[in-house]
């Protein structure tokens, strides 16, 4: 299982727009055959900081996700909303086994 944790910091005035744009990516990702989980989390202390927890069955599923229309549209719109570049960390998911 391929897991990615992405930190996204959004300009305060763009939070509502971010949620609208990212909802389309979230809903699209959940329909992908290789997707196991796609959570959007908000930091309770810093309301402009979000974490995306993505789990895909393998590297091929991750690559397929990055070619989808919903992902490409989201990334394009996201750039101008962010207060700093995204930070990503990748993990190997061990449990639960899929």
UniProtKB/Swiss-Prot annotation:
Catalytic activity as recorded in UniProt: (2S)-2-hydroxy-3,4-dioxopentyl phosphate = 3-hydroxy-2,4-dioxopentyl phosphate
EC number from the UniProt entry: 5.3.1.32
GO cellular component: cytosol
Enzyme class, first EC level, given as a word: isomerase
GO molecular function: (4S)-4-hydroxy-5-phosphonooxypentane-2,3-dione isomerase activity; oxidoreductase activity
PROSITE patterns: ABM (PS51725)
InterPro entries: ABM_dom (IPR007138), AI-2_Isomerase_LsrG (IPR050744), Dimeric_a/b-barrel (IPR011008), LsrG (IPR033672)
Keyword Glycosyltransferase appears in the UniProt entry: no
NCBIfam families assigned to the protein according to its UniProt record, in alphabetical order: PRK10486.1
Purpose of the protein: Involved in the degradation of phospho-AI-2, thereby terminating induction of the lsr operon and closing the AI-2 signaling cycle. Catalyzes the conversion of (4S)-4-hydroxy-5-phosphonooxypentane-2,3-dione (P-DPD) to 3-hydroxy-5-phosphonooxypentane-2,4-dione (P-HPD).
Subunit text: Homodimer.
This protein's name: (4S)-4-hydroxy-5-phosphonooxypentane-2,3-dione isomerase
Species the sequence originates in: Klebsiella pneumoniae subsp. pneumoniae (strain ATCC 700721 / MGH 78578)
């Amino acid at each position: 299982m391929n897991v990615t944790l992405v930190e996204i910091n959004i300009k305060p005035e763009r939070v509502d727009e971010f949620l609208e744009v990212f909802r389309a990516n979230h809903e699209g990702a959940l329909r992908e055959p290789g997707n196991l989980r796609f959570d959007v989390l908000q930091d309770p202390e810093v309301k402009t900081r979000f974490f995306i927890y993505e789990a895909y069955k393998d590297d091929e599923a991750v690559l397929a996700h990055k070619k989808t229309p919903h992902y490409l549209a989201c990334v394009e719109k996201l750039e101008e909303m962010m207060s700093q570049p995204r930070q990503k960390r990748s993990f190997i998911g061990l449990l639960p086994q899929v």
